[in-house]
Structure formats: structure tokens, C-alpha cells
Amino acid sequence: PWLVGWWDQFKRMLNRELTHLSEMSRSGNQVSEYISTTFLDKQNEVEIPSPTMKDREPQEAPRQRPCQQLPPPVPHLQPMSQITGVKRLSHNSGLNNASIPRFGVKTDQEELLAQEL
């Protein structure tokens, strides 16, 4: 019983946060839709508003759809890297193998450390 109450409270809080995120920008709306379709059991657990007119691209025609109608099933989910404003992670780091000491610490007595380890 307490778990059901907790879950309802969590869904309300998540709904508030996703609504706020979706109202901030077009990419925020895309992220909200991705989170709700990926991690929630039912499509209608969290209601995400459509983007405002200023967030829509100029060529996009306004959609006339009642709020209660469920969207059509999506054949596959959109990857996060294709959401506007989310950039692909690059794995270039400032570290290279030559700059990392053999045992993870810099020491003048590396052979003595090797014997101890």
C-alpha cells in the first residue's frame, strides 16, 4: 500500500519536471518525450504538452489533436544523439598511455614499488 502511494507521488513529481522541461525549448520537449516513451510503462502516465508556437520550426504545420488522444505507436525510439541540442560524446581525453605511470602513481622508486606490489 505505501509503495503505491509513493509511486503515484513519484509520477506526479516526474510529470511536473517533464512538463517544465518540455516547455523550456524544442530540445527539452524532445528529451521529455524520449524519457516518457523509454522509461514509463504506459504512454499516458505522463502528459507532455506539445511545443509552443515559438518553439516550432517555421515549416511545421500546427497539429490539431485532442489532449486525451494517444499518439500512434512509434516503431523505434529516436536515439538521444539525434535530439536537437544533444551532441555525440567524443572519447578524446587529455590522457594518453605515456602520461599514466605504470602503477598509477609517480615515483622515483618504481622498481621497489613493483617488488612490493
UniProtKB/Swiss-Prot annotation:
First-tier enzyme category under EC: hydrolase
A GO term from the CC aspect: cytosol
Coiled coil (residue ranges): none
Membrane-topology descriptor: Peripheral membrane protein
Single Gene Ontology BP annotation: cAMP catabolic process
EC number annotated for this UniProt entry: 3.1.4.53
The organism's place on the tree of life at top rank: Eukaryota
Biochemical pathway: Purine metabolism; 3',5'-cyclic AMP degradation; AMP from 3',5'-cyclic AMP: step 1/1
Keyword terms: cAMP, Cytoplasm, Hydrolase, Membrane, Phosphoprotein, Zinc
Subcellular location: Cytoplasm, Cytosol; Membrane
Chief subcellular location: cytoplasm
InterPro entries, per the entry: PDE4_UCR
Residue numbers spanned by region Catalytic: 78-117
Pfam families named among the record's database cross-references: PDE4_UCR (PF18100)
Compositional bias of kind Basic and acidic residues: 53-63
Record-stated family: Belongs to the cyclic nucleotide phosphodiesterase family. PDE4 subfamily.
Quaternary state and interactors: Interacts with LYN (via SH3 domain). Interacts with ARRB2.
Protein name: 3',5'-cyclic-AMP phosphodiesterase 4A
Native organism: Cavia porcellus (Guinea pig)
Lineage, highest ranks first: Eukaryota, Metazoa, Chordata, Craniata, Vertebrata
